[in-house]
Amino acid sequence: MIVRRFSDAKPYEAPSHRGYTSLRLFGAEAGGSKEMIVGLSHFLPGGGAGPDASPPEKVYFIVSGELTVIVDGKEHVLKANDSCYIGPNETREIINRSNDVCTIVVAMLPPRAQ
């Protein structure tokens, strides 16, 4: 078992994201898992990502606040304890349209070597 203390998590940059901070909990440079990447992201009001698509599958779990996820022109407002699955190469945009910080857990498969 590996325990990762919040105080030991390291920040990372995610492409096409804005108004956010993210901490890598497991996988990639944080180690611990070779089969998935888990991060914790905080989106400020007005912060978000995309629209874009990437090969890895993703799951978002909303810890607190609310986040609007836009896929195929349809908007879904996710609140605390809601989650969603984003498929491989599925174009999505996420936006925090609230006045509070939105905190989410992101789990995804690591990119595979081509």
Predicted regions and their residues:
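Ligand-binding loop in jelly-roll beta-barrel domains
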Residues: 88-113
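Histidine-centered metal-chelating micro-motifs
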Residues: 48-50, 68, 84, 88-94
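Short acidic-glycine-tyrosine-enriched beta hairpin
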Residues: 74-88
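Short histidine-centered beta-strand/loop micro-motifs
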Residues: 15, 48-54, 95-97
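A short, N-terminal "cap"/entry segment at the start of jelly-roll beta-barrel domains
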Residues: 1-35, 114
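Structural motif
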Residues: 66-68, 75, 91, 101
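Short, conserved beta-strand element in jelly-roll/cupin
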Residues: 40-43, 54-69
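Conserved short histidine dyad/triad with adjacent acidic residue
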Residues: 24-27, 38-54
